[in-house]
Structure formats: C-alpha cells, structure tokens
Amino acid sequence: MTTVVAQGTFDLLHPGHLHYLREAAGMGDQLHVILARRENVTHKDPPILPNEQRREMVAALDPVDEAIVGHDDDIFIPVERIDPDLLVLGYDQHHDRGDIADALAERGIDCVVRRASEYEPGYEGAVLSTGRIVERILETRD
C-alpha cells in the first residue's frame, strides 16, 4: 500500500485544491492531508477560516482518507507519524522540493517528494486562489 501526504492551508476551498488532492490521491492508495495551523502561516495572509473548520471541509472530500491539523511547532511531526511513501506538494506552494526531501531524509523519513501539476479548468472565469476569491467578494459586495 502506498501512503501519500498532501499539505497546505486549504482556506476557502476552490477547484485548484480539489485538483491537487485528487492528483495526490491518484498517486497512492491512502491520502493523508496535513492542514497548516493558522498561527504557522507566515508566507502569506493568514487563513480566514479556523483550523478545525478547514480540516472538517477537507476531511469531507472523497479523495481524502484522513485530514489533520499540523503540529504547533514542528511541521514534520505529523509526517513522521504518518510515515508516507510519497509527499506531494501543490504546484504553487512556496516549499522547495529538494529542501523538503533533505529535511525528511535528515529525520530518517524515506519518502519521495513530488510536485502536483497546475489545474487547467475547462471553462472561463475560474477563481483559483483564496486571495482572488476574497478580492472578488470585496469587488461585488458593498
């Protein structure tokens, strides 16, 4: 059995998130998703929704076998517990694939790191980022 981990913020779910999770699930037999804690998101605006609400939404998706909120201090502790065969990064996540692979190896986690492909919707006007969704809401609501 191939165990896969995907990770991210998953704030205001959109089709890009679904694409990422479906693709990651298709690379193995079991998909575990680790959601970044609001307080640990420092590379962009913090999530709008609370940790547990985001986890609940992701856990409800068909491709997902388990969804957990990440550790308070150490992002690799949940990965150690899951002990995946594969960790799949989102196509636009800021993490460097090589740096993640090195950090996993330093902890003795034998895990391949891949990057998911970009989602290409088959329709016009798709809004594929939380930031753009928020902008659209602000533009259309007074």
From Swiss-Prot:
UniProt GO BP: FAD biosynthetic process; FMN metabolic process
Catalyzed reaction equations: FMN + ATP + H(+) = FAD + diphosphate
Keyword Hydrolase (UniProt): no
Residue numbers binding ATP: 9-10, 14-17, 92, 119
Protein keywords: ATP-binding, FAD, Flavoprotein, FMN, Nucleotide-binding, Nucleotidyltransferase, Transferase
EC main group: transferase
Any Pfam family hit: CTP_transf_like
EC number: 2.7.7.2
Molecular functions per Gene Ontology: ATP binding; FMN adenylyltransferase activity
Pathway linked to the protein: Cofactor biosynthesis; FAD biosynthesis; FAD from FMN: step 1/1
Highest taxon of source: Archaea
Coiled-coil residue spans: none
Cofactor dependence: a divalent metal cation
Nucleotide-binding listed as a keyword: yes
Functional note: Catalyzes the transfer of the AMP portion of ATP to flavin mononucleotide (FMN) to produce flavin adenine dinucleotide (FAD) coenzyme.
Family per similarity comment: Belongs to the archaeal FAD synthase family.
Record's subunit section: Homodimer.
Protein's name in the database: FAD synthase
Gene that produces this protein: ribL
